[in-house]
């Protein structure tokens, strides 16, 4: 088995933090190496050391049997190591072809850009990924998933020996994901080495040959995928077995808090259900079924065209998110970076953003009270941040999600709507979020949990609503619900 890349004993420290401590990674020709670990385990730092963004404090990097130290991403890319970042890096007002070959445009013999050649080569790359768009289309006109495929095409254009994919399927549809997997299989057949970074265990077992696990910046081990189970992998990542991933809390539900009757509007068609105090109701369904639209409509982010909503026996009209907040309904978006958090602002500013009226007095803000409340939530939610003034964009996905939920709870709501509460969150942080949800439930909060993760819905919910084409197609008690029943109701069987 030919080793293309070998990272051994790498250390990296920042002021007050040892980010990497004896980190190791090997990449083999014709194989996919999963790089696993909780958020904050050191995966991104290791990749930045490899590509020359950070210098290492100790250790060695060998690429194609020679010692290397790249002075930046351009040098590593030119040497044949490409990285496809989780965050998109495209210019919206340029075409697909211009983005793929930016800075490397094909030239004619007289020095002008050879547009025909550039579009031909770009179209070949897109076809290889199953993308049907013309390479002349602007990137701004593409969906997030389609833009991600352009990023992958860009990396493939370098014909690299080693390709690092960081959460490559996060924004992809099932069809796009399968197209990507087909490309990965082709790359394996060409003897290229792939590093696949993902929190999605199902994908790891589906496409990867080997796995390397980091924990707290340390190398825990390298294993062959065929020789381990999901439980083995989780134990390597978090240092303990997660036999009970979904800690369901059994308790009697209280009074009816939210009563939705024949509500329609914005992709929702004649929806009725009740939500009680101290109850978690899961909302399941396929993509486009109307789950997110339901959450946003109840909150006031989308208009209601028919039906009635009663909160604690009082009819309410949420015509805006502010109305929703005023009426005690909080919606935590599935897109915490787009709709949820202001990444350039601090933890404190994000957390108190919708609750400043609680801290206002005679036209000013009681800053000490605000700081104390934020510190209480940081402690209660076990948010890993140096302090309340840390920029929220620098936190891990799990900690960002905790900040988003804390912001909602700070408004003291009656109803908490969680849309994909653990998307992009590692297995250890998921467990913490589930425990927090149970605490809210114990305190009598009414929770509507929208999720595409069926085990999550089944594991945490007291009842499950299944949506299809904007309607509720079925309702199941916790005891009745199974994955088979949920899927059958979602597809209309």
From Swiss-Prot:
Record-linked Pfam families: ABC_tran (PF00005)
UniProt organism field: Haemophilus influenzae (strain ATCC 51907 / DSM 11121 / KW20 / Rd)
SMART domains on file: AAA (SM00382)
Subunit and interaction comment: The complex is composed of an ATP-binding protein (RbsA), two transmembrane proteins (RbsC) and a solute-binding protein (RbsB).
Keywords: ATP-binding, Cell inner membrane, Cell membrane, Membrane, Nucleotide-binding, Repeat, Sugar transport, Translocase, Transport
Recorded GO MF terms: ABC-type D-ribose transporter activity; ATP binding; ATP hydrolysis activity
Reaction catalysis annotation: D-ribose(out) + ATP + H2O = D-ribose(in) + ADP + phosphate + H(+)
Protein name (database record): Ribose import ATP-binding protein RbsA
Enzyme class label: translocase
Function, in words: Part of the ABC transporter complex RbsABC involved in ribose import. Responsible for energy coupling to the transport system.
Mode of membrane association: Peripheral membrane protein
Stored InterPro entries: AAA+_ATPase, ABC_carbohydrate_import_ATPase, ABC_transporter-like_ATP-bd, ABC_transporter-like_CS, P-loop_NTPase
Gene Ontology CC: plasma membrane
Subcellular location: Cell inner membrane
Family: Belongs to the ABC transporter superfamily. Ribose importer (TC 3.A.1.2.1) family.
CDD domains attached to this UniProt entry: ABC_Carb_Monos_I, ABC_Carb_Monos_II
Residues given in the record as ATP binding sites: 37-44
Chain ranges of the ABC transporter domain: 5-241, 252-491
Enzyme Commission (EC) number: 7.5.2.7
Record Gene3D superfamilies: P-loop containing nucleotide triphosphate hydrolases
């Amino acid at each position: 088995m030919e080793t293309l890349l070998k990272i051994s004993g790498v250390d990296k420290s920042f002021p007050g933090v040892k980010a990497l401590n004896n980190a190791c990674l090997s990449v083999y020709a014709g194989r996919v190496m999963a790089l696993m670990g909780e958020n904050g385990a050191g995966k991104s730092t290791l990749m930045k050391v490899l590509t020359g963004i950070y210098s290492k404090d100790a250790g060695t990097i060998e690429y194609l049997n020679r010692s290397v130290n790249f002075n930046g991403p351009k040098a590593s890319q030119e040497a044949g190591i490409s990285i496809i970042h989780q965050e998109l890096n495209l210019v919206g007002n340029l075409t697909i072809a211009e983005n793929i070959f930016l800075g490397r445009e094909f030239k004619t013999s007289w020095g002008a850009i050879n547009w025909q050649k550039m579009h031909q080569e770009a179209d070949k790359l897109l076809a290889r990924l199953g993308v049907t768009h013309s390479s002349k289309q602007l990137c701004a006109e593409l969906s997030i998933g389609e833009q991600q495929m352009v990023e992958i095409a860009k990396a493939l254009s370098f014909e690299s020996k080693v390709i690092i994919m960081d959460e490559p399927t996060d924004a992809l549809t099932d069809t796009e994901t399968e197209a990507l997997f087909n490309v990965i299989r082709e790359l394996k057949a060409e003897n290229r080495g792939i590093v696949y970074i993902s929190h999605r265990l199902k994908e790891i077992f589906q496409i990867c040959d080997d796995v390397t696990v980091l924990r707290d910046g340390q190398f825990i081990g390298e294993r062959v995928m065929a020789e381990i189970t999901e439980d083995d992998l989780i134990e390597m990542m978090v240092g303990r077995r997660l036999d009970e991933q979904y800690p369901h809390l059994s308790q009697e539900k209280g009074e009816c808090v939210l009563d939705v009757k024949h509500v329609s509007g914005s992709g929702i068609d004649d929806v009725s259900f009740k939500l009680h105090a101290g109850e978690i109701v899961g909302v399941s369904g396929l993509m486009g079924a109307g789950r997110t639209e339901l959450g946003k409509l109840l909150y006031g982010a989308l208009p209601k065209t028919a039906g009635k909503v009663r909160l604690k026996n009082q009819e309410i009209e949420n015509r805006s998110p502010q109305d929703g907040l005023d009426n005690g309904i909080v919606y935590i978006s599935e897109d915490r970076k787009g709709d949820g958090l202001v990444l350039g602002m601090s933890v404190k500013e994000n957390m108190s953003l919708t609750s400043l009226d609680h801290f206002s007095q005679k036209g000013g803000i009681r800053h000490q009270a605000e700081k104390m409340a934020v510190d209480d939530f940081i402690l209660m939610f076990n948010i890993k941040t140096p302090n309340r003034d840390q920029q929220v964009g620098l936190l891990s996905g799990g900690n960002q999600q905790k900040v988003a939920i804390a912001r909602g709870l700070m408004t003291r709501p009656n109803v908490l709507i969680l849309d994909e509460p653990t998307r992009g969150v590692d297995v250890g942080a998921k467990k913490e979020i589930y425990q927090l949800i149970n605490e809210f439930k114990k305190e009598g909060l009414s929770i509507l949990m929208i999720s595409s993760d069926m085990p999550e819905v089944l594991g945490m919910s007291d009842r499950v609503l299944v949506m299809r084409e904007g309607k509720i197609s079925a309702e199941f008690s916790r005891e009745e619900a199974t994955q088979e029943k949920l899927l059958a109701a979602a597809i209309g069987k």
